[in-house]
């Protein structure tokens, strides 16, 4: 069987599992009166979303993990790369699950403490490095203008920075109905194409499994959202994306393919620096999607424009570097 056909089966499997079990989670949360607490610092009109079921990411993460494992096993391709990708998605998903669970239990918007979340994110990244190093993985990192540097210490630091950074970047982007979902479909779709060209079945099947779950999730997450992915979804998606870029030996590609995630994070950093040094804010509100909301843009307009930016930049990357 061709790698594309097998990967498409993984996509359909993940999609079907998510479509079946997501309504179950939604109904369960409604029946137990559980839902997302909306932060007071956000746009005031977001308060009407308070009580919307959350933790939807739990479903599509589990669906993707089940799908990629059984399809890879079926194709006799359940190798270390598959396990590294699964651990990144599941590991960061578990961190998000804990964060979401604390928020729901205590009926507040604060889950894990920042240092607790960071420590757990670093641990998952280190575990991935240890698994990779046990199989004579090539620890080569391309540094612009310096070439490839072979250093396990440098590579470890980079992986920690990349996984922690992008898991949080996707998390910051998950502030509007459907926004992070659409952006992630574009990014994972781009990497699926790259993996197909490289004939990398493990990464292709993984990306397609995630895409299948996200397509199904989007049915329930577009505006007005019936459920949010929560940190269980956003942290998992970001950690998975960062790991995919590394497994394809194209980590820097994520700066362009994931340009919206980068801009969302940069807007928060710049806002903090500006306010602490000058007492003035650069943006009306951060992350930057809220800035455009404050300018009068509808959620749908922000979503569509941001999705298009992500899509155009992904196409641009493929056009230049293939």
From Swiss-Prot:
Cofactor dependence: Mg(2+)
UniProt membrane topology term: Multi-pass membrane protein
Pathways involved: Cell wall biogenesis; peptidoglycan biosynthesis
Keywords of the record: Cell cycle, Cell division, Cell membrane, Cell shape, Cell wall biogenesis/degradation, Magnesium, Membrane, Metal-binding, Peptidoglycan synthesis, Transferase, Transmembrane, Transmembrane helix
GO cellular component: plasma membrane
EC number: 2.7.8.13
UniProt keyword Cell cycle, yes or no: yes
GO terms of biological process kind: cell division; cell wall organization; peptidoglycan biosynthetic process; regulation of cell shape
GO molecular function: metal ion binding; phospho-N-acetylmuramoyl-pentapeptide-transferase activity
Subcellular location: Cell membrane
Residue ranges of the TM segments: 9-29, 54-74, 82-102, 122-142, 145-165, 176-196, 200-220, 227-247, 255-275, 302-322
Principal EC category: transferase
Domain of life (superkingdom): Bacteria
Catalytic activity from the UniProt record: UDP-N-acetyl-alpha-D-muramoyl-L-alanyl-gamma-D-glutamyl-L-lysyl-D-alanyl-D-alanine + di-trans,octa-cis-undecaprenyl phosphate = Mur2Ac(oyl-L-Ala-gamma-D-Glu-L-Lys-D-Ala-D-Ala)-di-trans,octa-cis-undecaprenyl diphosphate + UMP
A Pfam family it matches: MraY_sig1
Family indicated by similarity: Belongs to the glycosyltransferase 4 family. MraY subfamily.
Function: Catalyzes the initial step of the lipid cycle reactions in the biosynthesis of the cell wall peptidoglycan: transfers peptidoglycan precursor phospho-MurNAc-pentapeptide from UDP-MurNAc-pentapeptide onto the lipid carrier undecaprenyl phosphate, yielding undecaprenyl-pyrophosphoryl-MurNAc-pentapeptide, known as lipid I.
This protein's name: Phospho-N-acetylmuramoyl-pentapeptide-transferase
